Amino acid sequence: MCASFSPTLDSRSRQLLRTLISCYIQNGEPVGSKTLAQQAGLDISPATIRNILADLEELGLLNSPHTSAGRVPTAHGYRMFVDSLVQMQPPSEDDIRRLRVEMAGGGTQALLGNASEILSAMTHFVGVVSAPRREQFVFRHIDFVPLDARQIMAILIFADNEVQNRVIEPRRVYEPGELERVSNYLNAHFIGRTLADIRTTVLCELRKAKDEMEQLLAHSLDLASQMLVPNDSEDIVVTGQTRLMALQDLSDMDRLRELFEIFASKREILQLLERTINAPGVRIFIGEETGMVSMEDISLVTAPYAAHGQVLGVLGVIGPKRMAYDRVIPLVQVVAQVLGTALEPPTMP
């Protein structure tokens, strides 16, 4: 959960803070009172501006670098900016149409890769997308292939045309004809349902006494219960890591090396994304809000993506704290919506 930081400010202070942070994001240089007098659109003297800036610094919203008379935003300043001051610049209708074209068609993995690439290319930062758990996807077809006397391969085909193979060791030996009858039964009764939903039904039915079931049903449910053991392993798609090397804001090579190690392991990034999966809308972590020392100079903007009303995963952008939040926030939101629509399986016949 990202903490809000919103001290009470009058309208002049809010306007000066908004203008200063916007100028700093654009130019990367400390902003002085003369620049603010020209850019803020307020009819006040430079002396009054300096007094207001001193008050904002006292509140912990700004900081004065030793080598400059200007000021830069702190993490608290950025937090207040994104919470209440930023003026969003959403993608144009043409951009949104292009996004839909680029995200049309293809299997799940291809769509996740496209989304990550788009986020990285349009922001020049790092794009990340967490992959959905397969248990959330819609079942279309299954085949069983005997590997040997003790092992069977279950070939699962989902509504998005992705294929997953699972090797199981059944509790009894099945003849090829039996496997065909079992697969026919499962295909007839469970098409169009998620694996999680199928598992719930199967486990419920298995609680009934076996002598109350037809033999085919018992065998089908027995195989299905073994095939549908939950697989909690998830992955994320990360694109554009090397873009961070060109950023002046991230010039600490030791910190950058630690960040690349996090990208390589993916575990910490995945845990961070999971913190936002049940939160509606865009979530923003600024610096130490990530809970990781190596990301104290980093911001993460995330949004969940969903299909047919069910949240499947989270995507986002990782970049420096000095990022164009006015463009990145609505872009992340739009890409999440477009990805969710692209992942919606077609209506089953």
Curated annotation (Swiss-Prot):
SUPFAM superfamilies: GAF domain-like (SSF55781), Winged helix' DNA-binding domain (SSF46785). Gene3D superfamilies: 3.30.450.40, Heat-inducible transcription repressor hrca homolog, domain 3, Winged helix-like DNA-binding domain superfamily/Winged helix DNA-binding domain. One of its GO terms (biological process) is negative regulation of DNA-templated transcription. InterPro entries: GAF-like_dom_sf, HrcA, HrcA_C, WH-like_DNA-bd_sf, WH_DNA-bd_sf, WHTH_HrcA_DNA-bd, WHTH_transcript_rep_HrcA_IDD. It holds the Pfam family HrcA_DNA-bdg. One of its GO terms (molecular function) is DNA binding. Negative regulator of class I heat shock genes (grpE-dnaK-dnaJ and groELS operons). Prevents heat-shock induction of these operons. PANTHER family: HEAT-INDUCIBLE TRANSCRIPTION REPRESSOR HRCA. This is Heat-inducible transcription repressor HrcA. It comes from Xylella fastidiosa (strain M12). The gene is hrcA.
